[in-house]
Curated annotation (Swiss-Prot):
Protein name (record): UDP-2,3-diacylglucosamine hydrolase
EC number: 3.6.1.54
Membrane topology: Peripheral membrane protein
Protein's pathway: Glycolipid biosynthesis; lipid IV(A) biosynthesis; lipid IV(A) from (3R)-3-hydroxytetradecanoyl-[acyl-carrier-protein] and UDP-N-acetyl-alpha-D-glucosamine: step 4/6
Cofactor note: Binds 2 Mn(2+) ions per subunit in a binuclear metal center.
Coiled coil location: none
Gene source species: Sodalis glossinidius (strain morsitans)
The encoding gene: lpxH
Positions annotated to bind Mn(2+) 2: 41, 79, 114, 195
Lineage: Bacteria, Pseudomonadati, Pseudomonadota, Gammaproteobacteria, Enterobacterales
Length: 239
């Protein structure tokens, strides 16, 4: 059996086609897998496990159905949903993982992560990331009224869009030295990540590979690891 990896689905109520496509993926492709790993940005925004958004319940039910069939599901936080907590994970039946995880899949030593920590040339983003990952600041934010959290999140997203519009594509992409440092430190032969929305499988020195997941904007994207190797799949939301 194969292990599946996805990232950057960016689920939100404003994009029902993406939601339908992801639910179809869970019922068809994921149900035939040995395990499913979601490498961040499952949701476009996450302001707390107490958000009563009906979409969150719908996704929790679908993921719970998958795990109840004996297919484990694991989650690494992204830059959009880094506040997703234990309460929602329990509702989904998924297991929360640290920001970086090393695993052995058959003969492959694989390191998985969301990918934003590899974009070390984007100094502004890395400073922002360090700030919002401070525990005290997260606790303060989650203590605010829900509607205030939503307004803050909307403002932060708008600021991010404006900031990214002034950055070059190279700055927002991964840093090759950062990639090699992670692979050297972990001894991994394969790296799988998302975040950049640039799906591809890159050959690296020393017979190593970096597999990048695509975003679920107009089609689905998944990486499959099996005895046949590492494969990138892109498919229609109904396929």
């Amino acid at each position: 059996m194969s292990t599946l990896f996805v990232a950057d689905i960016h689920l939100c109520a404003q994009e029902p086609a993406i939601t339908a496509g992801f639910l179809h993926f869970l019922r068809t492709r994921a149900i035939a897998a040995q395990a499913l790993y979601i490498l961040g940005d499952l949701f476009e925004v996450w302001i707390g496990d107490d958000d009563p958004n009906p979409l969150h319940h719908e996704i929790a039910v679908a993921l719970q159905a998958l795990t109840q069939r004996g297919i484990p599901c694991y989650f690494i936080h992204g830059n959009r949903d880094f506040l997703l907590g234990k309460r929602y994970a329990a509702a989904c039946g998924i297991t929360l993982l640290p920001a970086q995880r090393v695993m052995q899949l058959d003969e492959l030593r694989v390191v998985i992560l969301h990918g934003d920590t590899l974009c070390t040339d984007d100094n502004d983003y890395q400073r922002f990331r360090r700030r919002v990952h401070q525990r005290w600041l997260q606790r303060l934010f989650l203590s605010l009224p829900l509607q205030l959290r939503l307004r803050i999140a909307d403002r932060m997203r708008a600021n991010s869009l404006r900031a990214n519009a002034g950055k070059t594509a190279d700055i927002m992409d991964i840093n090759a030295q950062a990639v090699m440092a992670v692979m050297d430190d972990t001894g991994a032969t394969v790296m799988i990540h998302g975040h950049t929305h640039r799906p591809a499988i890159h050959q690296l020195p020393g017979e190593r590979r970096r597999a990048v997941l695509g975003a679920w904007h107009h089609q689905g994207s998944a990486i499959e690891v099996s005895t046949s190797g590492v494969m990138l799949h892109e498919f229609s939301f109904g396929g």
